[in-house]
A protein has these predicted regions:
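Pre-Walker A adenine-sensing motif
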Residues: 1-14
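Accessory nucleic acid-recognition modules appended to NTPase machines
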Residues: 14, 170-255
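Hydrophobic anchor at the beta1->P-loop junction of P-loop NTPases
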Residues: 22
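Conserved lysine of the Walker
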Residues: 30
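Hydrophobic positions on the alpha1 helix immediately C-terminal to the Walker A/P-loop
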Residues: 33, 37
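Short glycine-rich substrate-engagement loop in P-loop NTPases that contacts/grips substrate
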Residues: 45-76
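Conserved catalytic/switch belt of AAA+ P-loop NTPases
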Residues: 89-112, 119-121
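Short regulatory helix/loop adjacent to the ATP-binding pocket of P-loop NTPases
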Residues: 112-128, 143
Length: 255
């Protein structure tokens, strides 16, 4: 198991009458982190997954009694895949307001979906954390600084999703990356309602892959893909919100 820097921060963030929202890409280790948190807490805890219909329906009820039955006599309620719950922000607000002696954690992979649903109702009621693939510091802490430095090229080429880091065989790493891209990263985008040309996002990613670390022209991207600049900007925003890309703004002293 790779020790994650975020674990002690989550432990200290658990406060009665408050919520914690944990965002991160799929397969980055959020559920594993939550399980480690469970193993290290003395609080009576209920862990539920919104992948299960019965929990999804209860969490979407906006009914104090239904939500109270879900919490029962637990001191900490953890909701995994919370973005799948309709009006999750409002229902979390009800939980936080109506059950001030309990603490709550909600995790989600599609940050845009979860953020839009939780930010306004939970203003002042939550702490927000972002979980990313394993950092070089975490690798060094787990495997030792010498091994981390020796394997630096490997991390740079293959990336540092936890399963990729722990897999020793290159063919298996390649298979895992293919599944990760096809089954998880694209899914959040391609299942979006109103996304009229999902194939254009895939084409956009291919173009961006050749420009990593370089200045990117939205006008050139729009011309290459035969779509307007506003659509390119929207697609880039979506890609950033589901953790596929990270935009680095140009440096300027004239702020």
């Amino acid at each position: 198991i790779i020790d994650r820097y975020l674990l002690p921060q989550l432990h200290s963030a658990i406060t009665p009458g408050k919520g914690v929202v944990l965002y991160g890409p799929r397969q980055v280790g959020k559920t594993t982190l939550v399980m480690e948190l469970l193993a290290g807490t003395t609080l009576k805890t209920q862990l539920i997954s919104a992948d299960e219909l019965r929990y999804r329906e209860a969490l979407a009820s906006q009914d104090r009694h239904v939500l109270g039955n879900l919490l029962a006599d637990n001191e900490l309620l953890i909701i995994d895949e919370a973005q799948r719950v309709e009006n999750i922000g409002l229902n979390l607000k009800i939980l936080v307001d109506q059950f001030p002696k309990a603490a709550f954690i909600a995790t989600g992979s599609a940050s845009f979906a979860l953020a839009n649903k939780v930010s306004e109702p939970l203003t002042g009621r939550t702490l927000t954390y972002y979980m990313y693939p394993v950092s070089y510091g975490e690798i060094s802490q787990t495997y030792g600084p010498f091994e981390a430095r020796e394997q630096l090229n490997r991390w740079l080429i293959w990336g540092t999703y936890p399963e990729i880091v722990m897999e020793e065989k290159a063919p298996k790493r390649e298979q895992l990356l293919g599944e990760l891209v096809g089954s998880y990263l694209y899914r959040d985008l391609l299942e979006l309602n109103g996304l009229r040309k999902p194939e254009k996002i895939v084409d956009l990613l291919r173009l961006l892959a050749f420009q990593i670390g370089q200045e990117v022209s939205l006008a050139e991207l729009a011309t290459s893909l035969a779509i307007n600049r506003a659509t390119i900007d929207r697609y880039l925003d979506l890609l950033e919100k589901v953790f596929v890309i990270f935009r680095v703004r140009g440096f300027s002293r004239n702020l």
